[in-house]
């Protein structure tokens, strides 16, 4: 069963890298993925919220702090699982492949944590926030630097930690 799940994961990655591959989309997603490194876009959004919403500043700062907390937790899981980045014969990743481990995706984890935490503060924007997080997660296998299961696990970790952290403040 595990072998068939891994094979399905690999096949989906191959399909993303071959059948759906478009140069312009790759460039746009690579630029967008850069904003997700270390959760920087989510931290910046939460800090901007803290600047403009003084009444709820502490909650915004808590949201900003939740992103690196999620990154740290995600790193711990990577060290336990130790899954290597995808290497597909004849199908190169877009840009440089990070030297770090693959499972789970930190981009997905920090994006879903950020969307969850910020979404508690601006409920009308939740669909857009989760859409932005989903696009960030999608970018990773599309660019060839993660398996689809890496981003699913990262999204789950980010959502769960985001909800836990939101409940703690």
Show where each model-derived region lies.
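Membrane-embedded catalytic cores of phosphoryl/pyrophosphoryl-handling enzymes
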Residues: 90-169
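Interfacial segments of alpha-helical transmembrane regions
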Residues: 48-72
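Transmembrane helix-loop junctions in multipass membrane proteins, especially transporters and channels
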Residues: 54, 79-87, 145-149
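Membrane-water interface at transmembrane helix exits
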Residues: 49, 74-82, 119, 162-169
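Small-polar-interrupted transmembrane alpha-helices in polytopic inner-membrane proteins
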Residues: 64-80, 127-139
């Amino acid at each position: 069963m595990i072998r068939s799940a891994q094979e399905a994961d690999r096949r989906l990655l191959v399909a993303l890298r071959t059948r759906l591959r478009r140069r312009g989309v790759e460039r746009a997603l690579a630029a967008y993925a850069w904003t997700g490194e270390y959760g920087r876009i989510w931290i910046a959004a939460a800090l901007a919220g803290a600047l403009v919403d003084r009444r709820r500043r502490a909650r915004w700062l808590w949201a900003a702090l939740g992103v690196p907390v999620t990154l740290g937790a995600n790193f711990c899981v990577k060290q336990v699982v130790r899954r290597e980045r995808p290497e597909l014969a004849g199908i190169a990743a877009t840009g440089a492949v990070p030297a770090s481990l693959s499972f789970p995706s930190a981009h997905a984890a920090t994006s879903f944590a950020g969307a969850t935490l910020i979404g508690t503060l601006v409920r009308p924007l939740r669909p857009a926030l989760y859409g932005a997080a989903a696009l960030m997660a999608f970018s990773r296998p599309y660019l060839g630097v993660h398996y689809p299961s890496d981003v699913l696990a990262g999204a789950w970790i980010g959502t769960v930690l985001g909800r836990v952290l939101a409940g703690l403040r």
